[in-house]
Amino acid sequence: MGLPWYRVHTVVLNDPGRLLSVHIMHTALVSGWAGSMVLYELAVFDPSDPVLDPMWRQGMFVIPFMTRLGITNSWGGWSITGGTITNPGIWSYEGVAGAHIMLSGLCFLAAIWHWVYWDLEIFRDERTGKPSLDLPKIFGIHLFLAGVACFGFGAFHVTGLYGPGIWVSDPYGLTGKVQPVNPSWGAEGFDPFVPGGIASHHIAAGTLGILAGLFHLSVRPPQRLYKGLRMGNIETVLSSSIAAVFFAAFVVAGTMWYGSATTPIELFGPTRYQWDQGYFQQEIYRRVSAGLAENLSLSEAWSKIPEKLAFYDYIGNNPAKGGLFRAGSMDNGDGIAVGWLGHPVFRDKEGHELFVRRMPTFFETFPVVLVDGDGIVRADVPFRRAESKYSVEQVGVTVEFYGGELNGVSYSDPATVKKYARRAQLGEIFELDRATLKSDGVFRSSPRGWFTFGHASFALLFFFGHIWHGARTLFRDVFAGIDPDLDSQVEFGTFQKIGDPTTRRQAV
């Protein structure tokens, strides 16, 4: 009998062996995809410039996740932090990819074995001889094992006790590296930007999981609770598992989009809120002010600004600037960054220092307006020149660069001044190579944006899946049309699985 697409999974109902088989095959597919994706990304990744062409500018998706867990070296002889290495060891990017592909192959074979040998004694109830699973016991086993893995990750991998630690950086994404992390047991452990919270929460959650697993292995559920929550029905497991997954997906969508210690900006790119709040701009100005206080010249103060910090303060690195349906990496949009031209300082003929008003995140075009230190508009690039009062030509605006490639260069030509004023709307000014990748000049999102969009979308979908399967399992008797006032014995689950010879049939 042909099944409609939305009912095909009924073939593994009441068939524990093959239910296990298809889940092992799913693990094989996921692991195989992960390993293959790493190899693909390594084939197209250019590690030569970690400052101006980092992984997130190149659209890498799995490499950042490996890196935050402590993988930094390649068998190709390069390190993610720049420079060359001679002994990357087995746990390089390629080594991890190979391990996933080998796991995929083993899971593939295990899935075939369990599909062929589906009728195992372990899946049969000793009393009735029918296929059945002790779901509360299985829940306890899985909870215990997940707790052990969670505790082990927090206590050994993250702390560096037996493992590399995790990626840790400063608030401005400049000094990131893999290092051991001590657990934070105080209130600071609840700050999402404190790496120590990752260790302490995994240790605490793992301990709780181990204790809860042992509880569920040693204590049977009360009969009324067992029946009320339909603990004997495999669809209850499906429903609650979907709930766990969609909840996790919503959480990680939030930690990715808003930023946290688990999503360092060096690996995933800055967040849109850092542009909205002028986060990097404030730090740059603070450093310049500190330099001036040390009697440095303006040129020297700006020259001390790290190119990496200046690059974060550029709207093209804002993940909200790329459309959801613009495929490709950031480099395919505005191009590959080649160098920082320097910080432009605009002045009018009266000597006022002018600041270009920056483009807000969700604008594609924005008027060029220059204001003084008090916020008073002093110059602009007018839409209608006939009525202009503040045009660059009328006000006599000049621009001088400090730091970067154009350090000390000044322009008074109005066309050139307007060109740099337009570019200053977008933050710090960079030379971008659009020829190499045939970049089209239209901004793209970073992996931070793609991850958030994907996980938020699937979380919503899985939320409805949880409601659907939860309702099906809780109200199965209602949906099956069994009269609750029926006195006669009814075989529960009649016609639940099409083609099952054990299902009672009524002769027509």
Curated annotation (Swiss-Prot):
Secretion signal span: none
Residue spans crossing the bilayer: 21-36, 101-115, 140-156, 203-218, 237-252, 457-472
Gene Ontology molecular functions: chlorophyll binding; electron transporter, transferring electrons within the cyclic electron transport pathway of photosynthesis activity
Record key words, sorted: Chlorophyll, Chloroplast, Chromophore, Membrane, Photosynthesis, Photosystem II, Plastid, Thylakoid, Transmembrane, Transmembrane helix
Cofactor binding summary note: Binds multiple chlorophylls. PSII binds additional chlorophylls, carotenoids and specific lipids.
Compartments where found: Plastid, Chloroplast thylakoid membrane
Cellular component GO terms held in the UniProt record: chloroplast thylakoid membrane; photosystem II
Quaternary data: PSII is composed of 1 copy each of membrane proteins PsbA, PsbB, PsbC, PsbD, PsbE, PsbF, PsbH, PsbI, PsbJ, PsbK, PsbL, PsbM, PsbT, PsbX, PsbY, PsbZ, Psb30/Ycf12, at least 3 peripheral proteins of the oxygen-evolving complex and a large number of cofactors. It forms dimeric complexes.
Classification via PANTHER family: PHOTOSYSTEM II CP43 REACTION CENTER PROTEIN
HAMAP family reported in the protein's UniProt record: PSII_PsbB_CP47
Name of protein: Photosystem II CP47 reaction center protein
Species of origin: Piper cenocladum (Ant piper)
Taxonomic classification: Eukaryota, Viridiplantae, Streptophyta, Embryophyta, Tracheophyta
